[in-house]
């Protein structure tokens, strides 16, 4: 089966290095969304718009750290069952993890969107940039389902030993984000709202690439029949898997 790397055989050191390099690159690229937005906004709109994006960045880093860490943790049992060659159990974990992620994404999106204004007031956002900061942050909050979708699907792909494909997908999404920034901010004059829409679209694109790749090349991950059923024990294990990681990433 293509692009499945059995990391239980061969040199552990070599496999870890080969796996880790694209993984680290991927985390850097995910942070680049905000950096790219800030650079283009600051260059072509002005200081206030740049400050608005900057005011949102620390908030987004905190929330995205939690989301990313959770999704990475949910992929751990999937990787363990793949290594044990228990493929039916692996797919059952995939199904239950997707349910949990869907619930978390909806809840976090709803809560952050509703309290977006209060969050900005809590961090003492200046009045002259408040409107732009609100628009940018709200659009990023609304993109949380796409972000979590990418992270969980990328986690499943990495569970099979392939950290390169998710990295390539992030490169493509980052290029799309840059292109949309220029089109929406400069071409259409949409300001920070354009930057937020560009980021949301890029994250949705990365998620779609992961899903398409799994459908075409990694059907071993797709649950069928009884594997889709809700499982209390597996759900509890999935809930406990990400705890230390998501806390560390959201500090």
Name what the model sees in each region:
Residues 1-20, 78-143, 187-238:
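Short alpha-helical transmembrane segments in multi-pass integral membrane proteins
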Residues 13-32, 59, 63, 142:
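Residue-level signal for short hydrophobic patches within transmembrane helices
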Residues 23, 27, 39, 76, ...:
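Transmembrane alpha-helix boundary and packing residues in multipass membrane permease domains
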Residues 24, 28, 32, 36, ...:
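Generic alpha-helical transmembrane segments of integral inner-membrane proteins
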Residues 41-61, 127-132, 192-193, 236-238:
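Interfacial/gating helices of multi-pass transporter permease domains
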Residues 50-110, 147-166:
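Small-residue-rich hydrophobic transmembrane alpha-helices
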Residues 101, 156-179, 193, 197-200:
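Alpha-helical transmembrane segments of multi-pass membrane transporters/permeases
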Residues 239-246:
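Conserved small/polar residues in nucleotide/adenosyl-binding loops
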